[in-house]
Curated annotation (Swiss-Prot):
One of its GO terms (biological process) is mitochondrial translational initiation. PPR repeats lie at residues 247-277, 282-316, 429-461, 462-496, 497-531, 598-632, 683-713. The gene is ppr4. Residues 1-16 form a transit peptide. InterPro entries: Pentatricopeptide_rpt (IPR002885), TPR-like_helical_dom_sf (IPR011990). Component of the MRH5C complex, composed of mrh5, ppr4, mtf2, and sls1. Proteins mtf2 and sls1 form a subcomplex that serves as a scaffold to bring mrh5 and ppr4 together. The MRH5C complex associates with the small subunit of the mitochondrial ribosome. The lineage of its organism: Eukaryota, Fungi, Dikarya, Ascomycota, Taphrinomycotina. It holds the Pfam family PPR. RNA-binding translation activation factor that as part of the MRH5C complex specifically recruits cox1 mRNA to the mitochondrial ribosome for translation initiation. This is Mitochondrial cox1 translation regulator ppr4. It is found in: Mitochondrion.
Length: 931
């Protein structure tokens, strides 16, 4: 068969059996060739690369380029080709074959060889093309640089032909074509070919709604290997104006490539090109740009861009991923109420919560912005939309939101629901959430319930869970429960990590348990982990507690080598060391040497300046903190307000100014929530010093004003739980006003907080199968925690002659397990004398101070009664001389009256009563005789 006959056969087959095959004009829209292509015989191409290197592309450049290329392939309309009808004015195949340009020769040869196979499906056709390329390379390796252009044109023709016959193929099949073209070194031609693919061939390829495009990895490879992708993309929009969707896909994919690589400036430039020039604003592109701004912490710019986009395309406001980004901005940035308002507005307009992720993020945002009243209504809305489709993540987000609010009732309710409806293996993550809220961790009931469920369901826990539990119980200073839970997890095979050893050491340092501190120091040394970062920080704390400068220097050397991120902590410990040594100027010198002091450093410096009575320096410190952009926290507020209050009337005015400036309603949620201050005692403690100072100055009006400010805050913010210092200050205020009712209310509040936070945990009932009960009562570290509060309230009761109530409340505290110090015991004796109960006072002196057990504790080497009497008359005596003097005066009065009233109102002659004292307690009798 001759070649001419073959051409006629092919032409007849296409002409009479199918519509005319109209190849796309090969050069009218074809761009400049790659820089790697050089055509020695065609000098007209030498300047074509200038177009690809230009920063801007205009219409005249494109036209001039097209004219150059068309001139090369100029042919006569009278030329007859066996491949095309006479009416076709396109370039004949014969002219391509006879061209002196090697690229055109390769293309002509491939078309000549592969035209008969256009009827094949894509993959068989690709196999034929690959065979052809391999044979051509074997025959002439020099044509390798000419193959990509020919390959691209061949498939452009093939796709057009197939599309005209309603042929479709999958993205996976097309991706194989592009991968082969990439292997040939034609990355630029991949983008050209993609821009020419008919939309009907594979609609999936022109979907701009998703960044996870089927050809994403191929595009990424191309963008890496193209010298100037932005310019090429702009050129494609000029050369292929009808391929608008394909070009938008390329722009969007390039945006994703840039933002992933961190080239944000180019990304902004490309998005501006899309948004302003081409008026493209797909969900994906908008999300990419907002994400890129968020990664750079440019939250305000991200919000501004969002506003511009929704002004043009309001539907974008309903996109769940963009909505989630807005909520992310509102929760991670210092303060982005605009982002939160936009997100809430979008949810409100849509009248639905679009996704699980958005709901979870929304819960966190509501907590941050102190909008706790919206949590439960939104939960109901979520329930209505998703019809009880509560996933473990959703339960976690709901319970976490309630935990951060301190709403114990609803925490219990939703936790119980989560146990029934979700996987408890996920619920164990709530332990970390409990750790971040002292409202829950100090109450500890939820912690015990969660541990009980973990044990019952035999859910595996890890080292992190052990560290959290140790921290929770050590925060309560409940060492028995902490040791019990440590043993329980150890029995389960959970290894005690370095962080766990650090937490244990921290707990014993806090409890001042010297024996246990030495025990664990020995374990840490044997394990060789003294230079672990977390252990080293606890050793710093031990050095601070013991005021051991040598140990602190050793820890400093370790920190400089292994803990570069812990320099702030080191500076904090060093400042506190000098403060405890009363070297206040040295502490300030350390502060001045810190390059970027944090809020803790500022708080310590403020406390030092307050103790030095340097009001001017304190004001300058406040201004410096503001100028450096350090937002005040609960800790810094307490430090500054307390320090100002120590500076007299002028300082009190500054405290009031500082308070009113920083305690604005819109700032409170940021300042006082479990995320920013683990210790929830900060909000009320902030008011304690002000109330105390105003009360001591007799300015009751201002004291009441401060108290009402807090009560207003407390009524609207369930994250704030009154602490004992605040209750004492408030109680002192009403005691000074002789308001028995309100004083009693604050006293009851003190006992309520104490019963929640200071009572031992029945941990044995949770983890011990032997049913050995835990020691009940007050945690040893808190046995004397209520002495100051009790002294204030009992003194008030004595001043208003409410001795019966005083007796009741005294017994009430003793039954709870609290202990009174010697100072309060001396006052108790005086109060009994005020109530004309001499016999009860003498019995208390004997039982508390002069029992044989107490004398043995106080004077282990007492050799005689005279030495005991000498001790109790010395300044070191726990029984004050003033107390003995009051007893002696009362006895002298009884001698004058000739009788003493004992229990049940019985009157006893004074002489007989003194004889009884001498017989039963000779030491007391002789002691009183010496006064």
């Amino acid at each position: 068969m001759s070649k001419s006959f073959a051409y006629r056969h092919i032409w007849c087959f296409w002409r009479f059996n199918t519509p005319l095959l109209w190849f796309p004009q090969p050069l009218k829209y074809w761009p400049a060739f790659q820089q790697s292509h050089t055509f020695n015989s065609m000098s007209v191409f030498k300047n074509d690369n200038a177009i690809a290197n230009q920063t801007t592309v205009n219409e005249s450049d494109v036209k001039r380029n097209v004219e150059k290329i068309n001139d090369i392939y100029e042919c006569s309309n009278n030329t007859k080709s066996p491949c095309f009808p006479n009416s076709d004015s396109r370039i004949p195949l014969v002219n391509w074959k006879t061209s002196t340009n090697p690229t055109l020769q390769v293309r002509a040869y491939m078309l000549d060889l592969l035209l008969p196979f256009f009827t094949l499906d894509l993959l068989p056709f690709l196999n034929k093309v690959c065979e052809c390329c391999n044979h051509m390379l074997l025959d002439n390796p020099k044509i390798k640089q000419d193959l990509p252009f020919a390959f691209c044109y061949l498939f452009s023709s093939y796709f057009s032909y197939k599309s005209s016959r309603q042929y479709t193929c999958s993205s996976e099949e097309i991706s194989k074509v592009f991968r082969h073209l990439n292997r040939l070194g034609g990355s630029e031609y991949v983008l050209h070919l993609f821009a020419q693919i008919p939309k009907a061939l594979c609609k999936e390829l022109t979907d701009v709604r998703t960044l996870n495009h089927p050809l994403r990895s191929i595009f990424t490879f191309c963008f890496k290997n193209i010298s100037n992708p932005p310019n090429l993309l702009k050129l494609l929009t000029k050369l292929y104006p009808r391929s608008d969707r394909a070009n938008e896909v390329l722009y969007t994919q390039y945006l994703g490539f840039l933002t992933k690589r961190g080239d944000y400036q180019i990304a902004i430039y490309m998005f501006d090109e899309m948004y302003r020039t081409h008026h493209w604003s797909s969900f994906t592109a908008c999300r990419l740009m907002i994400e890129s701004l968020v990664r750079q912490n440019k939250f305000e710019e991200a919000i501004s861009l969002y506003k511009k986009i929704i002004a043009k395309r309001p539907k974008i406001a309903r996109d769940k991923k963009i909505l989630n980004l807005l909520l992310y901005i509102s929760t991670v940035s210092n303060r982005s109420p605009d982002a939160f308002k936009l997100a809430l507005q979008s949810i409100s307009n849509a009248n639905q919560i679009p996704s699980f992720d958005v709901f979870s993020r929304l819960m966190s945002a509501l907590v941050k912005y102190n909008m706790t009243e919206m949590i439960l209504p939104l939960v109901k809305q979520y329930d209505h939309k998703f019809r009880n489709l509560y996933s473990p993540n959703i339960f976690l987000s709901i319970v976490q939101a309630l935990v951060f609010c301190g709403d114990m009732v609803n925490i219990q309710r939703w936790y119980n629901m989560s146990r029934v409806n979700s996987e408890l293996s996920r619920i164990k993550h709530l332990l970390n959430c409990f750790l971040n809220s002292s409202t829950v961790s100090l109450d500890v009931s939820m912690v015990l319930e969660l541990l009980r469920d973990l044990k019952k369901k035999k859910i595996k826990v890890d080292e992190r869970t052990l560290v959290i539990c140790i921290t929770i119980f050590s925060r309560r200073k409940d060492l028995f429960a902490m040791e019990k839970i440590h043993q329980y997890f150890s029995d389960q095979g959970i290894k005690t990590s370095n962080q766990a050893y650090a937490a244990l050491l921290d707990a014993y340092i806090e409890a001042e348990d010297t024996e246990k501190i030495e025990l664990y120091l020995g374990k840490i040394r044997r394990l060789g982990i003294t230079e672990d970062v977390s252990i080293n920080r606890m050793l710093m704390r031990l050095a601070l507690d013991r005021l051991d400068w040598d140990l602190l220097e050793q820890c400093t050397k370790v920190a400089e080598r292994k803990d570069p991120e812990g320099q702030d902590y080191l500076s904090t410990i060093t400042m506190l060391y000098h403060v405890r040594q009363h070297e206040l100027n040295l502490a300030l010198r350390i502060f001045s040497g810190i390059q970027k002091p944090n809020v803790v450093h500022y708080s310590i410096a403020a406390t030092v300046l307050g103790n030095l009575n340097q009001l001017d320096q304190l004001l300058l410190l406040e201004k410096r903190m503001e100028s450096e952009g350090k937002a005040p926290t609960a800790l810094s507020l307490v430090a500054f307000v307390s320090s100002y209050c120590k500076q007299g009337a002028e300082g009190l005015d500054e405290a009031k100014r500082y308070m009113s400036k920083n305690f604005q309603p819109d700032k409170r949620a940021l300042l006082f929530n479990p995320r920013t201050a683990n210790d929830m005692t900060y909000p009320p403690s902030l008011f304690s010093s002000l109330i105390k100072e105003y009360t001591s100055l007799g300015d009751i009006k201002e004291a009441k004003q401060v108290l009402s400010t807090y009560l207003e805050y407390f009524s609207k913010n369930i994250t704030s739980k009154p602490d004992i210092p605040f209750a004492i200050a408030s109680m002192r205020l009403y005691c000074s006003l002789h308001d028995t009712v309100l004083s009693r209310q604050f006293w009851d509040l003190i006992l309520q907080v104490a019963q929640q936070n200071f009572i031992t945990t029945d941990i044995a009932a949770v983890v011990d199968d032997k049913n050995i009960p835990s020691p009940s009562g007050v945690i040893p570290a808190y046995k004397s925690a209520l002495n100051v509060a009790a002294e204030t309230y009992f003194s008030f009761l004595a001043s208003v002659n409410s001795f019966q109530e005083l007796d009741q409340e005294w017994s009430r505290l003793e039954k709870l397990g609290f202990e009174y110090d010697d100072s309060l015991q001396n006052k108790r004796i005086i109060w009994l004398l005020y109530d004309d109960r001499l016999d009860a006072a003498i019995k208390r002196v004997y039982n508390i101070f002069l029992s044989s057990k107490r004398i043995e504790e106080l004077i282990p080497d007492a050799s005689s009664q005279n030495s005991i009497i000498s001790f109790f008359l010395s300044p070191d005596s726990p029984l004050y001389f003033s107390t003995l003097k009051a007893l002696r005066d009362k006895l002298d009065m009884a001698v004058e009256d000739d009788f003493v009233r004992i229990s049940q109102g019985i009157l006893v002659p004074t002489v007989k009563y003194l004889q009884t004292i001498r017989r039963d307690n000779e030491i007391l009798f002789n002691l009183l005789a010496k006064v």
